[in-house]
Amino acid sequence: MNKHDLRLELLLKRKALDKAKKLEADLEIQSRLLLTKEYRECDKVLVYVSNDIEIDTKGIINAAFANKKKVAVPVTNDDFSLSFYYINSLRELKEGKFKILEPVNRDNKVDDFENSICVVPALCCDLSGNRIGYGKGCYDRFLSEYTGVKICLV
């Protein structure tokens, strides 16, 4: 099966998930991430703001706030590159491109990724860290330059 067909199949499976089972799985995945050494030891969490079919990240974001970590979420630029901006609350977000929640305030751009983790959306990945995302290549471009810890949520 080629990458395009696999992506379509996985999207259909995600959309067909029972809401209660998805919520249970999301909470388990969030809990596992929050228990990792990488999360506990980082100062900054770069994290996507989830939509309905992605692994929910709002619990991760709120936990990071509670754990006094800096939280940054992405903005998709016109060239499909990503820029991350610090937020202090989920209330600082509004719907942007692709109907994705993005920070309203663009004054606090992240320019130092030291001691950070990046929580990455994915449809699937292998044990070597190769992932299939949602097809625009935004994270692929960012991750090719990012030297911190990358954690895929699938």
Predicted regions: what is each one?
Residues 5, 12-15, 113-118, 127-131, ...:
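Surface-exposed, charge/polar-rich loops and edge strands
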Residues 51-53, 123-127:
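Short glycine-rich anion-binding loops that position phosphate/pyrophosphate groups of nucleotides
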Residues 1-113:
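N-terminal active-site beta-alpha-beta segment that forms phosphate/nucleotide-binding
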Residues 61, 133-138:
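Charged helix-capping and loop-helix junction motifs
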Residues 47, 120-121:
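Redox-cofactor binding/interface segments in oxidoreductases and associated redox assembly factors
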Residues 101-103, 121-124:
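A structured binding-face within diverse protein domains that lines the active/interaction site
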